[in-house]
Amino acid sequence: MRPPAFWAAGPDHPAARGLGPLGAVYGALAARRMDRPGARAGCPVLCLGNFTLGGAGKTPAALAVAALVAELGAAPAFLSRGYGGRLAGPVRVDPAHHAAAEVGDEPLLLARRAPAVVARDRPAGAALCRSLGADVIVMDDGLQNPSLAKDLSLAVVDGPAGLGNGLPFPAGPLRAPLARQWPHVGGLIVIGNGAGGDAVARAAERRGLPVHGARLVREADDLAGRRCLAFAGIGRPEKFYATLAEAGAVIVGTRPYPDHHPYRARELAALAEAARRLDAELVTTEKDAVRLPRAFAAGVRVLRVRLAFDDAEALRRQIRGALGAP
Protein backbone atom coordinates (compact mmCIF):
# COMPACT_ATOMS: atom_id res chain seq x y z
CA MET A 1 0.00 0.00 0.00
CA ARG A 2 1.29 3.43 -0.97
CA PRO A 3 0.28 6.08 1.60
CA PRO A 4 -2.18 8.60 0.14
CA ALA A 5 -0.83 12.11 -0.28
CA PHE A 6 -3.39 13.62 2.09
CA TRP A 7 -1.85 11.71 5.02
CA ALA A 8 1.08 14.11 4.78
CA ALA A 9 -1.20 17.16 4.64
CA GLY A 10 -2.89 18.78 7.61
CA PRO A 11 -5.80 17.23 9.50
CA ASP A 12 -8.15 19.73 7.84
CA HIS A 13 -7.66 18.23 4.38
CA PRO A 14 -11.11 17.37 2.96
CA ALA A 15 -10.27 13.66 2.61
CA ALA A 16 -8.99 13.48 6.18
CA ARG A 17 -12.08 15.25 7.49
CA GLY A 18 -14.38 13.01 5.49
CA LEU A 19 -12.71 9.87 6.82
CA GLY A 20 -12.42 11.26 10.34
CA PRO A 21 -15.47 9.44 11.80
CA LEU A 22 -14.25 6.10 10.44
CA GLY A 23 -10.78 6.82 11.79
CA ALA A 24 -12.23 7.60 15.21
CA VAL A 25 -13.96 4.20 15.32
CA TYR A 26 -10.90 2.32 14.05
CA GLY A 27 -8.64 4.17 16.47
CA ALA A 28 -10.88 3.49 19.46
CA LEU A 29 -11.01 -0.23 18.70
CA ALA A 30 -7.25 -0.41 18.17
CA ALA A 31 -6.56 1.46 21.40
CA ARG A 32 -8.89 -0.79 23.39
CA ARG A 33 -7.11 -3.83 21.97
CA MET A 34 -3.69 -2.45 22.93
CA ASP A 35 -4.78 -2.22 26.57
CA ARG A 36 -5.35 -5.97 26.90
CA PRO A 37 -2.84 -7.85 29.08
CA GLY A 38 -0.36 -10.11 27.29
CA ALA A 39 1.18 -13.49 28.03
CA ARG A 40 4.66 -13.63 29.52
CA ALA A 41 7.34 -15.19 27.34
CA GLY A 42 9.55 -16.43 30.16
CA CYS A 43 12.36 -14.14 29.05
CA PRO A 44 12.72 -10.41 28.28
CA VAL A 45 10.88 -9.18 25.19
CA LEU A 46 12.05 -6.07 23.33
CA CYS A 47 9.64 -4.70 20.72
CA LEU A 48 10.62 -2.46 17.80
CA GLY A 49 7.36 -0.99 16.52
CA ASN A 50 5.99 2.24 15.18
CA PHE A 51 3.03 4.53 15.68
CA THR A 52 2.06 4.53 12.02
CA LEU A 53 1.35 2.23 9.12
CA GLY A 54 4.13 1.76 6.61
CA GLY A 55 7.90 1.76 6.74
CA ALA A 56 9.77 3.65 9.44
CA GLY A 57 12.92 1.54 9.71
CA LYS A 58 11.80 -1.13 12.18
CA THR A 59 13.84 -3.95 10.64
CA PRO A 60 17.20 -2.09 10.64
CA ALA A 61 16.37 -1.01 14.20
CA ALA A 62 15.62 -4.60 15.24
CA LEU A 63 18.93 -5.76 13.76
CA ALA A 64 20.84 -3.00 15.54
CA VAL A 65 19.12 -3.64 18.88
CA ALA A 66 19.79 -7.38 18.61
CA ALA A 67 23.48 -6.60 18.07
CA LEU A 68 23.50 -4.54 21.28
CA VAL A 69 21.74 -7.38 23.11
CA ALA A 70 24.42 -9.81 21.91
CA GLU A 71 27.15 -7.42 23.08
CA LEU A 72 25.62 -7.65 26.56
CA GLY A 73 26.20 -11.40 26.49
CA ALA A 74 22.62 -12.47 25.79
CA ALA A 75 21.34 -14.72 23.00
CA PRO A 76 18.64 -12.90 20.99
CA ALA A 77 16.11 -14.35 18.59
CA PHE A 78 13.77 -12.42 16.33
CA LEU A 79 10.00 -12.78 16.35
CA SER A 80 7.90 -11.49 13.44
CA ARG A 81 4.39 -11.89 12.16
CA GLY A 82 5.87 -12.49 8.72
CA TYR A 83 3.79 -9.90 6.89
CA GLY A 84 3.30 -10.87 3.25
CA GLY A 85 4.07 -14.55 3.87
CA ARG A 86 1.51 -17.34 3.75
CA LEU A 87 2.87 -19.46 6.62
CA ALA A 88 1.03 -18.89 9.90
CA GLY A 89 3.80 -20.54 11.93
CA PRO A 90 5.30 -20.80 14.35
CA VAL A 91 8.22 -21.71 12.13
CA ARG A 92 11.94 -21.00 12.22
CA VAL A 93 12.99 -19.08 9.13
CA ASP A 94 15.64 -20.73 6.96
CA PRO A 95 16.90 -18.38 4.21
CA ALA A 96 18.25 -21.37 2.29
CA HIS A 97 14.81 -22.96 1.98
CA HIS A 98 12.12 -20.35 2.62
CA ALA A 99 10.94 -17.72 0.16
CA ALA A 100 9.49 -14.30 0.94
CA ALA A 101 6.10 -15.57 -0.26
CA GLU A 102 6.20 -18.07 2.61
CA VAL A 103 7.64 -16.11 5.54
CA GLY A 104 7.73 -12.47 4.41
CA ASP A 105 10.74 -10.43 3.38
CA GLU A 106 11.91 -8.93 6.69
CA PRO A 107 12.29 -12.30 8.46
CA LEU A 108 14.65 -13.48 5.72
CA LEU A 109 16.90 -10.50 6.48
CA LEU A 110 16.65 -11.03 10.24
CA ALA A 111 17.48 -14.73 9.97
CA ARG A 112 20.90 -13.90 8.53
CA ARG A 113 21.93 -12.43 11.91
CA ALA A 114 20.18 -14.57 14.54
CA PRO A 115 17.44 -17.21 14.81
CA ALA A 116 14.19 -15.78 13.45
CA VAL A 117 10.69 -17.11 14.00
CA VAL A 118 7.53 -16.25 12.10
CA ALA A 119 4.27 -16.66 14.00
CA ARG A 120 0.89 -15.01 13.82
CA ASP A 121 0.35 -16.40 17.33
CA ARG A 122 3.03 -14.38 19.10
CA PRO A 123 3.09 -16.38 22.39
CA ALA A 124 3.53 -19.61 20.39
CA GLY A 125 6.31 -17.93 18.44
CA ALA A 126 7.97 -16.82 21.67
CA ALA A 127 7.90 -20.41 22.92
CA LEU A 128 9.68 -21.55 19.75
CA CYS A 129 12.29 -18.79 20.19
CA ARG A 130 12.94 -20.06 23.71
CA SER A 131 13.29 -23.64 22.46
CA LEU A 132 15.97 -22.43 20.03
CA GLY A 133 18.07 -21.19 22.95
CA ALA A 134 17.07 -17.52 22.98
CA ASP A 135 17.12 -15.70 26.30
CA VAL A 136 15.94 -12.40 24.78
CA ILE A 137 13.24 -11.98 22.14
CA VAL A 138 13.44 -9.03 19.74
CA MET A 139 10.11 -8.34 18.05
CA ASP A 140 10.11 -6.73 14.61
CA ASP A 141 6.77 -4.88 14.77
CA GLY A 142 3.97 -5.72 17.19
CA LEU A 143 3.66 -2.54 19.27
CA GLN A 144 -0.12 -2.60 18.84
CA ASN A 145 -0.42 -6.37 19.31
CA PRO A 146 -1.19 -7.13 22.98
CA SER A 147 -0.87 -10.92 22.90
CA LEU A 148 2.72 -10.94 24.21
CA ALA A 149 3.82 -8.79 27.14
CA LYS A 150 6.82 -6.57 26.38
CA ASP A 151 9.59 -5.53 28.75
CA LEU A 152 10.57 -2.60 26.53
CA SER A 153 8.83 -1.17 23.48
CA LEU A 154 10.73 1.32 21.34
CA ALA A 155 8.75 3.26 18.75
CA VAL A 156 10.70 3.83 15.54
CA VAL A 157 9.97 7.16 13.85
CA ASP A 158 11.06 8.30 10.41
CA GLY A 159 12.51 11.76 11.04
CA PRO A 160 11.54 13.40 7.75
CA ALA A 161 8.04 11.86 7.66
CA GLY A 162 7.10 12.13 11.32
CA LEU A 163 3.51 11.06 12.00
CA GLY A 164 1.87 12.66 8.98
CA ASN A 165 -1.40 14.41 9.82
CA GLY A 166 -1.57 12.73 13.23
CA LEU A 167 -4.92 10.99 12.61
CA PRO A 168 -5.84 7.30 12.91
CA PHE A 169 -6.29 5.16 9.81
CA PRO A 170 -7.91 5.64 7.31
CA ALA A 171 -8.02 9.40 7.92
CA GLY A 172 -4.28 9.32 8.58
CA PRO A 173 -1.37 6.94 9.13
CA LEU A 174 -1.69 6.30 12.88
CA ARG A 175 -2.42 2.72 13.95
CA ALA A 176 -4.23 4.07 17.04
CA PRO A 177 -4.67 7.54 18.58
CA LEU A 178 -1.26 8.79 19.64
CA ALA A 179 -2.38 9.63 23.18
CA ARG A 180 -3.42 6.00 23.65
CA GLN A 181 -0.14 4.65 22.27
CA TRP A 182 2.25 6.64 24.48
CA PRO A 183 1.60 4.59 27.66
CA HIS A 184 2.84 1.47 25.83
CA VAL A 185 6.15 3.03 24.72
CA GLY A 186 9.39 3.14 26.69
CA GLY A 187 11.40 5.26 24.27
CA LEU A 188 11.86 6.47 20.69
CA ILE A 189 14.32 5.74 17.93
CA VAL A 190 14.21 8.63 15.46
CA ILE A 191 15.89 7.82 12.15
CA GLY A 192 17.11 10.83 10.19
CA ASN A 193 16.42 14.52 10.62
CA GLY A 194 13.20 16.37 9.98
CA ALA A 195 10.59 18.62 11.54
CA GLY A 196 8.14 15.73 11.87
CA GLY A 197 10.56 13.60 13.85
CA ASP A 198 11.61 16.58 15.97
CA ALA A 199 7.99 17.18 16.99
CA VAL A 200 7.55 13.55 18.07
CA ALA A 201 10.86 13.67 19.95
CA ARG A 202 9.76 16.77 21.88
CA ALA A 203 6.49 15.07 22.80
CA ALA A 204 8.42 12.04 24.07
CA GLU A 205 10.79 14.18 26.12
CA ARG A 206 7.83 15.96 27.75
CA ARG A 207 6.73 12.52 28.91
CA GLY A 208 10.17 11.73 30.27
CA LEU A 209 10.92 9.15 27.59
CA PRO A 210 14.43 8.73 26.18
CA VAL A 211 14.94 9.62 22.53
CA HIS A 212 17.65 7.82 20.57
CA GLY A 213 18.76 9.52 17.37
CA ALA A 214 19.93 7.26 14.56
CA ARG A 215 20.82 7.29 10.89
CA LEU A 216 21.07 4.78 8.08
CA VAL A 217 24.66 4.26 6.99
CA ARG A 218 25.63 2.70 3.66
CA GLU A 219 27.85 -0.33 3.63
CA ALA A 220 30.83 -0.14 1.29
CA ASP A 221 29.73 0.25 -2.32
CA ASP A 222 31.08 1.38 -5.68
CA LEU A 223 28.02 3.13 -7.04
CA ALA A 224 29.61 6.54 -7.60
CA GLY A 225 29.22 7.61 -11.22
CA ARG A 226 27.26 4.52 -12.24
CA ARG A 227 24.03 4.86 -14.20
CA CYS A 228 21.29 3.25 -12.11
CA LEU A 229 17.66 2.33 -12.60
CA ALA A 230 16.39 2.14 -9.03
CA PHE A 231 13.37 0.07 -8.06
CA ALA A 232 11.88 -0.61 -4.65
CA GLY A 233 8.74 -1.95 -3.02
CA ILE A 234 9.15 -0.43 0.43
CA GLY A 235 7.22 2.01 2.60
CA ARG A 236 9.13 5.12 1.54
CA PRO A 237 11.15 4.46 -1.64
CA GLU A 238 12.24 8.10 -1.76
CA LYS A 239 14.58 7.35 1.18
CA PHE A 240 16.23 4.66 -0.94
CA TYR A 241 16.60 7.03 -3.90
CA ALA A 242 18.12 9.70 -1.65
CA THR A 243 20.66 7.24 -0.25
CA LEU A 244 21.61 6.20 -3.77
CA ALA A 245 22.13 9.84 -4.70
CA GLU A 246 24.32 10.32 -1.63
CA ALA A 247 26.42 7.40 -2.85
CA GLY A 248 27.06 9.32 -6.07
CA ALA A 249 24.95 7.12 -8.30
CA VAL A 250 23.53 8.65 -11.47
CA ILE A 251 19.83 7.80 -11.16
CA VAL A 252 18.41 7.65 -14.67
CA GLY A 253 15.03 6.27 -13.62
CA THR A 254 12.99 5.04 -10.68
CA ARG A 255 10.29 2.40 -10.38
CA PRO A 256 8.33 2.45 -7.08
CA TYR A 257 6.15 -0.50 -6.11
CA PRO A 258 3.87 -1.10 -3.10
CA ASP A 259 5.45 -2.21 0.16
CA HIS A 260 6.17 -5.99 0.24
CA HIS A 261 5.34 -6.18 -3.48
CA PRO A 262 5.64 -9.71 -4.96
CA TYR A 263 7.44 -9.15 -8.26
CA ARG A 264 5.87 -10.85 -11.27
CA ALA A 265 7.77 -12.19 -14.26
CA ARG A 266 6.39 -9.54 -16.62
CA GLU A 267 7.44 -6.76 -14.22
CA LEU A 268 10.96 -8.12 -13.98
CA ALA A 269 11.14 -8.42 -17.76
CA ALA A 270 10.03 -4.79 -18.06
CA LEU A 271 12.68 -3.70 -15.56
CA ALA A 272 15.40 -5.56 -17.44
CA GLU A 273 14.28 -4.04 -20.75
CA ALA A 274 14.15 -0.52 -19.28
CA ALA A 275 17.65 -0.92 -17.84
CA ARG A 276 18.94 -2.09 -21.24
CA ARG A 277 17.27 0.82 -23.00
CA LEU A 278 18.68 3.33 -20.50
CA ASP A 279 22.12 1.70 -20.47
CA ALA A 280 21.81 1.42 -16.70
CA GLU A 281 22.27 -1.10 -13.91
CA LEU A 282 19.33 -2.25 -11.84
CA VAL A 283 19.67 -1.35 -8.15
CA THR A 284 17.34 -2.22 -5.30
CA THR A 285 17.14 -2.63 -1.51
CA GLU A 286 18.05 -5.66 0.58
CA LYS A 287 14.39 -6.10 1.44
CA ASP A 288 13.44 -6.19 -2.23
CA ALA A 289 16.33 -8.46 -3.17
CA VAL A 290 15.00 -11.34 -1.06
CA ARG A 291 11.72 -11.18 -3.00
CA LEU A 292 13.44 -11.63 -6.36
CA PRO A 293 14.02 -14.96 -8.11
CA ARG A 294 17.64 -15.96 -7.51
CA ALA A 295 18.50 -15.95 -11.22
CA PHE A 296 17.19 -12.39 -11.64
CA ALA A 297 18.70 -11.17 -8.36
CA ALA A 298 22.14 -12.25 -9.55
CA GLY A 299 22.09 -9.38 -12.05
CA VAL A 300 20.84 -6.70 -9.65
CA ARG A 301 22.95 -4.49 -7.43
CA VAL A 302 21.81 -4.28 -3.81
CA LEU A 303 22.28 -1.18 -1.66
CA ARG A 304 23.08 -2.41 1.86
CA VAL A 305 22.56 -0.16 4.87
CA ARG A 306 22.81 -0.47 8.63
CA LEU A 307 21.48 1.64 11.47
CA ALA A 308 23.99 3.66 13.50
CA PHE A 309 22.95 5.33 16.76
CA ASP A 310 24.10 8.81 17.74
CA ASP A 311 24.66 7.57 21.30
CA ALA A 312 24.73 3.77 21.31
CA GLU A 313 25.78 3.69 24.96
CA ALA A 314 22.57 5.46 26.05
CA LEU A 315 20.46 2.84 24.27
CA ARG A 316 22.68 0.06 25.63
CA ARG A 317 21.97 1.31 29.16
CA GLN A 318 18.23 1.31 28.55
CA ILE A 319 18.34 -2.21 27.12
CA ARG A 320 20.48 -3.38 30.03
CA GLY A 321 17.84 -2.06 32.41
CA ALA A 322 15.05 -3.85 30.53
CA LEU A 323 17.01 -7.10 30.68
CA GLY A 324 17.67 -6.70 34.38
CA ALA A 325 21.39 -6.94 33.67
CA PRO A 326 23.92 -5.35 36.07
UniProtKB/Swiss-Prot annotation:
Instruction: List the HAMAP family.
Output: LpxK (MF_00409)
The record ties this protein, via SUPFAM superfamilies, to: P-loop containing nucleoside triphosphate hydrolases
One GO BP annotation of this record: lipopolysaccharide core region biosynthetic process
Instruction: Offer one Pfam family short name for this entry.
Output: LpxK
Which reaction equations make up its catalytic activity?
a lipid A disaccharide + ATP = a lipid IVA + ADP + H(+)
Molecular function (GO) terms listed?
ATP binding; tetraacyldisaccharide 4'-kinase activity
User: In which pathway is this protein known to take part?
Assistant: Glycolipid biosynthesis; lipid IV(A) biosynthesis; lipid IV(A) from (3R)-3-hydroxytetradecanoyl-[acyl-carrier-protein] and UDP-N-acetyl-alpha-D-glucosamine: step 6/6
Q: Which organism is it from?
A: Methylobacterium radiotolerans (strain ATCC 27329 / DSM 1819 / JCM 2831 / NBRC 15690 / NCIMB 10815 / 0-1)
The organism's place on the tree of life at top rank: Bacteria
Record protein name field: Tetraacyldisaccharide 4'-kinase
What InterPro entries does the database record attribute to this sequence? LpxK, P-loop_NTPase
Q: Does the keyword ATP-binding apply?
A: yes
